[in-house]
């Protein structure tokens, strides 16, 4: 039995779960998420908990069991609490700001980079160098944060660029010169 898959999912009081065959719909204060689960995995609700079970012991069923449980747990957590990713901007003259819903980045290019958030995603900028991407769908929050980071990933020589909060960038030594002009 999958160690992750057999753990029950607790459903908070303000979250409503609807199961229709292989489709799971989760509604909460932050929004509504739905997902079609694989046919060899089933979800059942007993009171305030959800249990994900697999129908047979084939290899693919065992692989999808833990994945499906984690996806449903992320849906429940997302509509009740939400998710966020923090990004840090390092570099002279690099800054971010929010205009309307869009994130505007000045990253040393000849132009500003505008990123329009998908539905359900918000950008918050703290003191021009910290960006918080928040929303209720963990996958979209992560993809949007990766899109922002891809504008100027951290470079290994000076460490300038956009990085996740807590990300450690491996630094490289620069070129060593021959020793002055002759």
From Swiss-Prot:
Please provide the Gene Ontology terms (biological process) for this protein: cytoplasmic translation
Keyword Transcription assigned to the entry: answer is no
One MF term in the entry's GO annotations = structural constituent of ribosome
InterPro entries per the UniProt record, alphabetical: Ribosomal_uL6-like, Ribosomal_uL6-like_a/b-dom_sf, Ribosomal_uL6_a/b-dom, Ribosomal_uL6_bac-type, Ribosomal_uL6_CS
Give the Pfam families listed for this entry: Ribosomal_L6
The answer, when asked if Thylakoid is one of the entry's keywords, is no
List the record's Gene Ontology CC terms alphabetically: cytosolic large ribosomal subunit
Provide the alphabetized UniProt keywords: Ribonucleoprotein, Ribosomal protein, RNA-binding, rRNA-binding
Q: Which SUPFAM superfamilies match?
A: Ribosomal protein L6
Describe the protein's quaternary organization and the partners it interacts with.
Part of the 50S ribosomal subunit.
Q: Which NCBIfam families match?
A: L6_bact (TIGR03654)
Q: What does this protein do?
A: This protein binds to the 23S rRNA, and is important in its secondary structure. It is located near the subunit interface in the base of the L7/L12 stalk, and near the tRNA binding site of the peptidyltransferase center.
- Name the family the entry cites: Belongs to the universal ribosomal protein uL6 family.
Q: What is this protein called?
A: Large ribosomal subunit protein uL6
């Amino acid at each position: 039995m999958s160690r992750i898959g057999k753990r029950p999912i607790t459903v908070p009081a303000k979250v409503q779960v609807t199961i229709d065959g292989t489709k799971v719909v989760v509604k909460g204060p932050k929004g509504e998420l739905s997902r079609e689960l694989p046919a060899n995995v089933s979800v059942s609700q007993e009171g305030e908990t959800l249990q994900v079970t697999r129908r047979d012991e084939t290899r693919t069923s065992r692989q999808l069991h833990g994945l499906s449980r984690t996806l449903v747990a992320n849906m429940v957590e997302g509509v009740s609490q939400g998710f966020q990713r923090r990004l840090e901007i390092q570099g002279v003259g690099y800054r971010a700001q929010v205009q309307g819903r869009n994130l505007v980045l000045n990253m040393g290019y000849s132009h500003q980079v505008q990123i329009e958030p998908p539905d359900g995603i918000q950008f918050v900028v703290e003191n021009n160098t910290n960006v918080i991407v928040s929303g209720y769908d963990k996958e979209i929050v992560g993809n949007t944060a990766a899109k922002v980071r891809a504008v100027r990933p951290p470079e290994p020589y000076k460490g300038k660029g956009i990085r996740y909060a807590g990300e450690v960038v491996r630094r490289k030594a620069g070129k060593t010169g021959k020793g002055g002009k002759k």
